[in-house]
Amino acid sequence: MHAFLQQLPALIGVVIGALGSYVAIVRGDQARFRRERAARWEERRLEVYAEYARTLKKSVTLTYRVASHLGNDPHPHPLNLTEAEPLLAEATVGRDPSGEALILLGSPEVVEQARAWVTAVMEMERFMRTETHDPVAWRELMDRQRAGREGYYAAVRDDLALPPGHSGRWLTVPE
């Protein structure tokens, strides 16, 4: 028994060391799992954010083309409203599921900015469907849509901790 008592401090040290190693490994694995899960969700949110922007931009481009046909926009590929309607319907149908994914996975700030952007696009669509020739009013709608897009992209960058990006406003036609 005397020999056992002499070895007891060493045995306790081994047990404490083993428990310490176990705790360190478990905590390290948990931290790695949380980091990997966060990275996966960030990648997924980025996909959802980009997909929403792509689907909304389809509608924007179609409104530019119809507005060009009406003489409100300088877009180089005009399209009359009759030809555009099925394309607009398709763009809207594609926009709805990506909007639902955005609501599900997006941060409240991003969703709010997306709402502001899509509202501006819907106003452009309503204006275009009236077949009005008013370049000044169209320009105001375009400016609101562009501000909505900038707000959306800024919110996405903030949510994903990305650096600030380009505003997306560049001169395509000399003023």
Task: Please provide the spans of the model-predicted regions.
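Feature marks short, highly hydrophobic, charge-poor N-terminal signal-anchor/signal peptide-like helices
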Residues: 1-13
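Conserved non-transmembrane functional hotspots
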Residues: 19, 23-175
